[in-house]
Amino acid sequence: MKLPMSWLKGWVDPGLAPRELGDRMTLAGFELESIASAAPAFSGVVVAEILSAERHPQADKLQVCRVSIGGTELQIVCGAANARAGLRTALAQVGAVLPGDLKIKAAKLRGVESAGMLCSAKELGLAEVSDGILELPAEVALGADLRAVLDLDDPLLEFAITPNRGDAMSVQGLAREVAALTGAALGGPDCEPIPAAVEGASAGSPAQKSAAVSLSAGSACPRFHHRVLVDIDNARPSPLWLRERLRRAGQRSISPIVDITNYIVLELGQPMHAYDLDKIEGGALDVRFARGGESCDLLDGRTVELAPDVLVIADAAGPVAMAGVMGGVRTSVTPETTRVMLEVAWFAPAAIAGRGRRYGLTTDASQRFERGVDPELGRRAIERATRLMLEVAGGIVGAVEVTEVVAEDGAAAVRRAPRVTLRPAEVGRVLGLEMPPDRVVELLSRLDIQQVDGTAHPAAAVGETLTFQSPSHRFDITIERDLIEEVARLVGFEAIPVIDARAVQPIRALPTSQLEEQRLLDLFASRGWQEGVHFSFVDPVLQEQLFPGVPSHRLSNPIASDLAVMRLSLWPGLLRAAQENLRRQQGRIRLFEHGVVFPVGAPEIDRLGGVAVGGRRPEQWGEDEAPADFYDLRADLEALGGLVGQAGGLEFERASLGCLHPGRSARILRNGRPVGWAGELHPRWVRELGFPSAPLLFELDVAALTVEYPVFAEVSRFPQLRRDLAVVLAEEATFSSVLEGVTLSSSGLLRHVFVFDVYRGMGIETGRKSVALGLIFQDKNSTLTEEVIEGEMAAIRAALTLRLGASFRE
């Protein structure tokens, strides 16, 4: 929320410098994000009046203007279409410096001398686009410094508003906080009722009755203020003060009617909408939920297909607005609009929450209605808007009409602020401060939280309670702790003494078989991987591509359409992160993540996953760059075996998973039980996701990585013997099957088996391969003899022949 100091001082004078005020607000829960001036730096720009404007003798699109800055007349060549005699505007004199370090010098344009430049709002950094030179009010003094005239050194404070404080998303809301924190008096603009048929700029037309309004969805919209203004001049530009305030708050000027409705949102926090009364079909509006097949053409140019739970405002021809989110084009105001119907409605937060984001819409209105708008603010807002419209665009007003749903007790069915009970003793216990009850009452009253029951004298009994009425604009005050928080904010969190904790803090024992998370993370970090932390909710489209047909938990109110389901795997988040890194020219990526996944119908599962893209090693001079492959990934995973005390404890079994390359993927096993997957991303998704090469992926259950402590084994004093064996096998045979056959047939003298060559070619049948094994034998008790070794080798050959149909090369 951007807050100009000049606008704030129209409500309350804090008596603090901007930085001091920002620090005080930060400690009260409204973090100061930035302080800036209302305009970029420039100098030497003054107010000037154009005395005459003649066509340039050498250029049709230029004018030669004679301008006055008070006691001096100057000749300026200008190309703006709106340059005309009598206009007061901004003149950059010779020697002036404009934004972007543009220095103004005397110049000759097409043979005519020009002693400066008449400036547009864009050239002064006051607008992104502009149609001509700046037009200033006729009453501003000639020769005055423009920065002083427009107060362009006005500090702009930008605050972060937390989701629970929708009431602070306005100048009024922040002014209330400033007044409460500083003790300064709170003022505000004139919001007194304006009677019907008040004459404005063009008297003579009768005030007309508003369109009829009905509330079919009364629980979602129990109150609807509306009023008609006729003979409005919406073609004139908004006054400079209004355009400037909108600009400083981060909005652009559109037209007087739209500007004023936007101004009310910023000033009071009440979203409102203006309809062209002549475009409302049937002369009536109804607030209801959308019907099947309905759509709405919105002001931003989009057409949305409306779901049945979307609240709309409709006329006889169908929806004209998404209630609380955005208006529609069909009834929008234009420069030709002369009859306007103003709407100030109260929508229940639950009826608006998430509806806009479902369609990719986040508007000023939806942000406020989702958090909760003061149900008692509507009348003040419509009166304030009416007064501004009469001032800016003229016209005649009709009466304010209110359509509302009445509860059984005869009161309006809008939200009723709750009463909250507070134990004064609890304030001291929670905050660690001595706080007499009368002090608590005084602090809360600054926030319009009034005591309605109980005794607040300093010596009140320990067990006594006080009851407070929560103000209608505070949706976040419902329980005792909320009141205690308000007391803490006003006293200042920095005033709460620091007291060392005295509670016993038992430390839970960690099972010896459980792998410490930090050791797991350190292992991958030491092998060149970088840890990532990603959202637990992911893109439903990407997740369906990777795991087609697998159900996911869908969020009812996602923060974005591409973060709408809970993840079934760590891979969607890792792949998105890899894409973002590649877009930022990171050619070699090694990302891993430790987190939980959320299968439907099962508990959360703790997983470790990773993605690798690019070269095997970082680029270097000593060797050519080679892409990483499955075996590089496998080597990193096998290092986990040593971490859990079981070198080689992870097995890799050839298997297929839909999202992985069918010939370059494996199921990961531990002790014969599946614990994860590893492999290349399927070529289809490599292409569709735009990867330059196939990413390598792995994921496994952390719970399977239990630690097995090694058992002491005495080192043999006797020599090792090596024998090599060339085994001819079917092409599809795996090393794990060979290893299994060798180890099961050995008597226990075999210490190590490894592959040192694989051969295909002359002398080997098609469809078969020769795998050369190195076999290391050793006995603990004696030196091995040839007879013993030959017996071992014979047993191994027999086992491989029987199990794998192997033959042997000499």
Language-model features: where?
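Phosphate-backbone binding interfaces of nucleic-acid-interacting proteins
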Residues: 1-206, 341, 357-360, 364, ...
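Short, hydrophobic beta-strand segments
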Residues: 2-8, 154-162, 222-230, 364-372, ...
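Glycine/proline-enriched, intrinsically flexible loops and inter-domain linkers
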Residues: 4-5, 23, 63, 182, ...
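A carboxyl-terminal module marker
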Residues: 20, 27, 446-449, 467, ...
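Conserved mixed alpha/beta core segments that line enzyme active sites in large multi-domain catalysts
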Residues: 47-77, 143, 243-244, 261-330
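Mobile "lid/hinge" segments at catalytic clefts and subdomain interfaces of large enzymes
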Residues: 110-123, 130-135, 146-151, 155, ...
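Terminal amphipathic helices with adjacent charged low-complexity linkers/tails
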Residues: 182-216, 392-427, 433-434, 483
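Extended, well-folded interaction surfaces typified by the phenylalanyl-tRNA synthetase beta subunit core
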Residues: 420-589, 723, 776-778, 788-810
